[in-house]
Amino acid sequence: MHFNLYLKNKFLLYAYGKYFWYLEYTNASQIIAAYEGDKLLGVIIVDMKNEAKPYKSFWKTCYIKLIDQIQKFFFKGGVMAYNQANKEMFEEYTEKYTPDGEIRFLAADPDTKLKGIGTMLLNEFERRKYGKEIYLFTDDQCSYPFYEHRGFERIGEKDIVLELDDKINL
């Protein structure tokens, strides 16, 4: 997600980025990271069905719930539309497929000179969970060809209009 397209306020951008990271991190059963020395190059976060979520945290969960409530109060048009679209697409997907897990997050440092970090992370995950049915949700800011080249199929698409209140300095 490119949150900076929706939020101008640096504090809100930081707070929402933290929320998003905690949400994905605490729902993960698998996290694979790529490093060069101490520098993080990329990460894949996956939630596999029937696997423990070892990264749960009381305080991170409290933070997530607080931001969820703030979103529902201020940004209900955007959040609810997004969640509803994902729910509908998932229901459509599960009519034909039985997923074993979801890729919740995949990112590589765009400033690194090393190429192929995302592919390496996906390959390592596939090695660990070979033959499993995996899905992901993404937005129009992603690289669809990246996923399609690696065997993913685009099953559903929905246009979502984010109704944000312009009275709030975002």
Regions flagged by a language model, labelled:
Residues 1-12, 50:
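Helix-loop element at the rim of GNAT/NAT acetyltransferase active sites that forms part
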Residues 105-108, 114-127, 149:
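Conserved acetyl-CoA-binding loop-helix of GNAT-fold acetyltransferases
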Residues 17-20, 46-53:
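A conserved beta-strand-loop-helix scaffold within acyl/acetyltransferase catalytic domains
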Residues 119-120, 140-163:
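Conserved active-site alpha-helix within GNAT-family acetyltransferase domains
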Residues 9-31, 36:
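Active-site rim helix/loop that mediates acceptor-substrate recognition in acyltransferases
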Residues 50-101:
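Conserved acyl-donor/pantetheine-binding loop and adjacent beta-alpha core of acyl/acetyltransferases
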Residues 99-101, 128-141:
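Conserved GNAT acetyl-CoA-binding A-motif
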Residues 29-44, 80, 109:
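Conserved beta-hairpin
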